[in-house]
Amino acid sequence: MRKIILASGSPRRKELLELASVPFEIVVSEVEETIGAYSSPSDIVMSLALQKASAVAENNSDHIVLGADTIVTYESRILGKPSNEDEAKEMLQLLSGKTHEVYTGVAIIAKEKTVTFYERTEVTFWELTEEEIDTYVASKEPFDKAGSYGIQGKGSIFVQNIQGDYYSVVGLPIARLVRELKQFDIDVTHA
């Protein structure tokens, strides 16, 4: 029996698959993420998702492997995960009072085919005070999240508006993923 393998150690992606009753196992991709010369954020996230899934699929060719990647962009600037407090504060100051875009790319690899897709969501932040930013950064929540915030956590209080898929901002566009899995004869809507 084919298994679904999530090529990610992200606790948020794990929670979203569990929420949707998708049966899966985790094999963390150890691939070094490389961003080449891509023309768009959507190309970047789909390429990174494919890199992660491909690395795990090499040793799991009889199964279905899922890879995903999320980035935040503001005015053509890519905001990944912050490497320190100053970088986290800088990102949050940049996003304060403005609308930014969150892209999550997904790759599904199986013997018979490979599917990649992405979702784009616009998120608008309230104006943030320096104290709000300092307190949030001190909580350590920003450090494993693209754009330095978690919409599903304490960072939720910064969000004024969202246009698009909330779960994509969390890290996995689960409704779209469930529909795409039907191409691989996986239907969790009747489970």
From Swiss-Prot:
The record marks 12, 70, 152 as: Important for substrate specificity. One of its GO terms (biological process) is nucleotide metabolic process. It holds the Pfam family Maf. InterPro entries: ITPase-like_fam, Maf-like. One of its GO terms (molecular function) is nucleoside triphosphate diphosphatase activity. It is found in: Cytoplasm. Its EC number is 3.6.1.9. Keywords: Cytoplasm, Hydrolase, Nucleotide metabolism. Gene3D superfamilies: 3.90.950.10. The keyword Hydrolase applies. Its cofactor is a divalent metal cation. It comes from the Bacteria. It is an enzyme of class 3 (hydrolase). The active site is at 69 (proton acceptor). The keyword Cytoplasm applies. Signal peptide: none annotated. It catalyses: dTTP + H2O = dTMP + diphosphate + H(+); UTP + H2O = UMP + diphosphate + H(+). GO terms for cellular component: cytoplasm. Nucleoside triphosphate pyrophosphatase that hydrolyzes dTTP and UTP. May have a dual role in cell division arrest and in preventing the incorporation of modified nucleotides into cellular nucleic acids. Belongs to the Maf family. YhdE subfamily. This is dTTP/UTP pyrophosphatase. The lineage of its organism: Bacteria, Bacillati, Bacillota, Bacilli, Bacillales.
